[in-house]
């Protein structure tokens, strides 16, 4: 039986709010797997691919076809920590640097927690005229988590080089206009669609 609209929205919300940038897809894979294991055989390989097979199709001699979707999202990875405790980052996926300043993000830590941060750029009133006329580069941006030194960022906030970060966006649904707001819709909407389609075959 296919999921109801309410059930689909709940799954989309869970998938959208999973913090799973490219290379760190564990959370979104877990959400999809937990939903699917109620009606299907679920397997995961060493490359973190998740295979969902309706139980009644496991030993069938009928043709097999694949419904494919990916579970990651664009994100960031911390590549250095400044003496003042701010974090330089690389992008995982494509971002327009000019849209990022003042965005809230969540940064993963060595304590296996996520802490909030704000993407900051050099204030306009500190820029030279030449700087004001140039587009921003990722190298011009830092994430501020509130740390006041390198040691503070590492020891107290638990930040490490190589930790991922994602946009801090909660899922919401405008029932009146039937519109969803969130992050990671590409391609997690497809993940929901595929698992619901497979569920309907049971």
Description of each model-found segment:
Residues 1-192, 196, 200:
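N-terminal hydrophobic/helix-forming segments and targeting peptides
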């Amino acid at each position: 039986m296919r999921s109801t609209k309410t059930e689909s929205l709940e799954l989309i919300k869970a998938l959208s709010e999973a913090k799973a940038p490219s290379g760190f897809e564990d959370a979104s894979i877990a959400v999809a797997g937990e939903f699917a294991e109620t009606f299907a055989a679920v397997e995961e390989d060493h490359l973190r691919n998740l295979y969902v097979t309706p139980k009644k199709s496991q030993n069938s001699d009928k043709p097999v076809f694949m419904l494919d979707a990916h579970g990651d999202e664009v994100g960031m990875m911390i590549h250095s920590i400044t003496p003042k405790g701010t974090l330089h980052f690389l992008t995982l996926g494509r971002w327009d640097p000019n849209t990022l300043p003042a965005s809230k993000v969540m940064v993963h830590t060595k304590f296996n927690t996520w802490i909030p941060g704000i993407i900051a750029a050099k204030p306009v009133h500190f820029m030279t005229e030449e700087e004001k006329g140039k587009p921003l580069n990722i190298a011009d941006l830092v994430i501020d988590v509130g740390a006041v030194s390198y040691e503070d960022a590492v020891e107290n906030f638990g930040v490490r080089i190589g930790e991922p970060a994602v946009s801090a966006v909660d899922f919401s649904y405008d029932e009146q206009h039937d519109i969803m707001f969130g992050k990671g819709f590409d391609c997690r909407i497809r993940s929901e669609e595929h698992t619901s389609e497979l569920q309907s075959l049971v």
